[in-house]
Amino acid sequence: MLGVLMQVGVLGLFAVVAVGVFVVGDRVRPKSWRHSDDAGAGHMMLDMVNMFFAAIVAFVVVILWEQYDTSHAHTVSEGKALVSVYETANDMPAQDRKQIQSLVVDYTKQVVGDEWKVMDEQRRLSPAAQATLDDLRQAVASAPAADADAKSTQDKALTAVDAIAEARYDRGLDAGYRLPGFLYVALWFATVMLLFGTVFSGVVVTRRSILMTGLFGVVIGAVIVAIYQLDQPFSGGNHVSKDAYELALARFQHIAADAPVASGGNPR
């Protein structure tokens, strides 16, 4: 609470300093610099508000777009790791291969199904999908490693499972991400000042000015809606796509179809 009061105090101090500079400066500046009315001050304020709003929007959009790209990159990393585990399981005995590949498919389907809905509605990960991933890790860790080749295959699969878990952890953080509150405060403050600009500018109310103001409001509203949509990487109308997992599922089918050929007909 003390921090908030201090910040408000700093803002008030700047307001006092600005007014002080303005009043004192008016007394010392040449009379030729003065205007006959305060229209110049109004235009200056509107220009500053416009610039402030544009700067805040640009800053917020850059932050959110980078977060969106990062969230998508995490899904790609997870999808690649899933394919790696599935493919590596081909070099394991038949019973272990079937169990591991089945768990990989189940986990991937849970992510694009129930877990995606949970992230959309609750901004968190699904415990059921986490349980499946834990079962997958246990299955890989318990696979027999009778010789050096089998041990190498198991280690490779465990490394890929670790990559899945890491990408999943990052995705969980992405699902719960929100823009810092102070940026929303600054954004809404700039929006209110911008909307009141029509009052401060002294524009006459006519059909044309009403139409232009309405269009202006639509543009401002569209910007605000877009920002809120970007602030939810895995929910809303502009969420991160499932393409990495859907591609992984397609890859699983391809690997399964080629498995007998790749193994040369040898039993696993």
Language-model regions, residue ranges each:
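Alpha-helical transmembrane anchor segments
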Residues: 2-32, 173-268
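N-terminal positive-inside, membrane-proximal cytosolic segments immediately preceding the first
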Residues: 24-46
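Short extracytoplasmic
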Residues: 51, 57, 84-102, 252-266
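Transmembrane signal-anchor/signal-peptide helices with a preference for the extracytoplasmic
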Residues: 55-76, 231
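Juxtamembrane/interfacial segments around transmembrane helices
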Residues: 62, 94-112, 235-247, 263-268
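Structured inter-helical modules in multipass membrane proteins
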Residues: 71-72, 77, 83-176
